[in-house]
Amino acid sequence: MEIRNIAIIAHVDHGKTTMVDRILHQSNLFRDNQEVGELILDSNDLEREKGITILSKNVSVRYKETKINIIDTPGHSDFGGEVERVLNMADGVLLLVDAFEGPMPQTRFVLQKALELGLKVIVVVNKVDKPNCKPEDANEMVFELMFSLDATEEQLDYPVVYGSSKNGWMGEYYNTPTTDVTYLLETIIEHIRPARENPGTLQMRISSLDYSSYTGRIAVGRIHRGSIQMGDKVSIVQRNGELHYATVKELYLFEGLGKVKTKERIVNGEIVAIVGLENFDIGDTVADWENPEGLTSIAIDEPTMSMLFTINNSPFFGKDGKYVTSNHLRERLFKEIEKNLALKIEETASPDSFLVYGRGILHLSILVETMRREGFELQLGQPKVVAKEVEGFLHEPVELLFINVAEEFSGKVIEIVTKRKGDILNIEKKEDRVNLEFKISARGLIGLTNPILTATEGEAVVSHRFKDYEPWKGELTEKRNGALIAMETGTAIAYSIDKLQDRGKFFIDPNEDIYEGQVIGENNRQDDLVVNVIKTKKLTNMRASGSDDKTSIAPAIKFSLEEAMEYIGEDEYVEVTPKHIRLRKIMLKEHERKRQKNA
C-alpha cells in the first residue's frame, strides 16, 4: 500500500479542522451512531477555545489503495520548534487559505520552513461560499507570497483546489460546487509523491512525544530509512552524539483518530509510535543496533522570554485550588519539559520559585492556563526578555510585528509602536484597511496589545513572530500609570468605589472579596495610590431632602491571563487560581513597600 504524508498549514480560523473532519467523514471513519465532537484536531480544550494548534496531531485515512497520514502543524511562531520537526515527517503540504482574507502573516512562517525543506505545496482556497470573497485574488496573493519566499519553479507550479469545508465540498472551480471532497483526495494522490523505498539500516527521527501513564514516554516519528518491527533491538543516537540501546516493546501505526498495535515489519515512509525506549528526546534518531547512524538534528528554537513561577502565598491561598505546594509546582513543571521542548526551567535560591523560559507570552500563558485548569494555584512575576552577548555586545530578541487595522486608526497605531522604539517597515493598503509591518524588540511587545486595542476601538488584528537577535535598543521610556492598591482585607463596597472613580479605573466589582496589597485598579497618575474601598457610608437618623445618591459605577476592567501577564510591573505578581486571576504587590503592606523604596 502506498503512503502519503501530508502536513496542513493554515491560519487560525481558516477552516483547517473542519476540512479534516470532512475528509474523515468521507472515508467513513465515524460509525453512523458515534457522537463526534466537531473540531477533531484541536484535541485540547484550550486549542478549541483559542483556535490555535499547540502540539501537532496525526490523523490517518485510507482512500482507494492509499493511506494518507494528515499531520497538523502549529500555526503560531511561538511554537516554531514544533513546526520544523513536524514538517520533516511530511512529503508535501496543504496550504489552506481563506478566500476572503488570503494568506495571513503567521502562515508565512510555516510556509517558509516547508519551502526550505523542498516540500510540494497544494493550495486549498477555502470558504468560497463567503459573500464578497475573491478566490482568484486569494490564489494570486499565495503566488506572490511563495515567490517572495524564493520558491523554486517546480514549487510555484502548484495545483489549486477550491471549496467550502463548512458545506463539505472541494472542486476544481470555485463557482461549481461538487458533492464531496473526493477532488482534494485525488489531487493529493496525484501531486504528492509517495515515499520512495529507502533500504538500508534503520533511521527514524523522533519528531514528537506522547505520554501514557502505563508505558511512560512514547516516541513518534517517520521512518526515514530501513524498517522496524516489534522486538527489534535498536540504538538511540542523541543530538550530542551519545548512544543508548533499547528494545522495541510495542509498535503502533496511526489509523483514523487513534493508534493500532502492529506486529508487522514496517518500512520507511510510514509514521510510527514506539513504546519501550528510554533516555530519548525530540530530535534524537532511532537507529540500527549494530551500525547506528544519526540524522542531522533540528535546532530547537531558543527561549526569548523568562518568567518567575512561584507558589501562591496570598491571603486567599488554597481557597480554589487543590495543588498549592512547591512540590506540586516542581513536579508539574519538570513533567512539562519532557514534551514541551522550547521550555527551560531553572531553579532559584528559593525552593518555592522557578524561572521558566519560553518562546513568548503566548507560549508561557498556554502552560499557565493548562495548569490552572488542572487545579493549580501559583503566582507569576513580570515577564523578562532573554538577552545574550554577541561579540562582547548585549543583544536582545527582535520580532516582526504585523497589525491589520482600519485606515482611520493607522496613525494612532504607528505612534504607539514608534514610541516603543519600533521601526516601520511596510504599509500596505487594502480597501479601507491597512496592513502595517514593524520591527520591534520583544521588550517593546510586552503590554503593547492593550493600548493598541484601546486606540483602535478593539478593531486591530495583531500578530508577531521572532526575527533575530539585534543590539540592545536602550531603555524604553513609556511607563504605565500607577496602581490603585487595597488598604485592607474585606469586601468591596459600591459606595466607596463610586466615590473613588475620579481617581482611576477599577479592576474589581462591588461585593468582591479583596485583600490588603491587592492591585484593584489603575491610577490616573504615574504613582501608586492606596485606597480604602471597604468603607461603608456613615448613616444618620436625619433624612436628607434629596434622598440617597444613587451609585453609578463604570464596569470593571477584566484581564485575560495573557493581558494580566503583560500588564504587571516589576514589584507585582499575577495570582492565578482555577477561579480567579488577581494582580497584587509582591510586598502587601504599605510600610514594607515604603521601606524598600527608600532603601
Outline where the language-model segments fall:
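Conserved nucleotide-binding/hydrolysis modules and their immediate coupling elements
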Residues: 203-307, 317-319, 481, 490-540, ...
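A short, contiguous, amphipathic alpha-helix enriched in charged residues
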Residues: 314-337, 550, 554
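Long insertion/accessory domains within large nucleic-acid-processing enzymes
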Residues: 254, 258-260, 395, 440, ...
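P-loop NTPase switch module centered on the Walker A-proximal segment
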Residues: 1-97, 101, 141, 209
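Canonical P-loop GTPase G-domain recognition
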Residues: 120, 130-190
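Helix N-cap motif at beta-to-alpha junctions
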Residues: 225-227, 277-279, 358-364, 406-410, ...
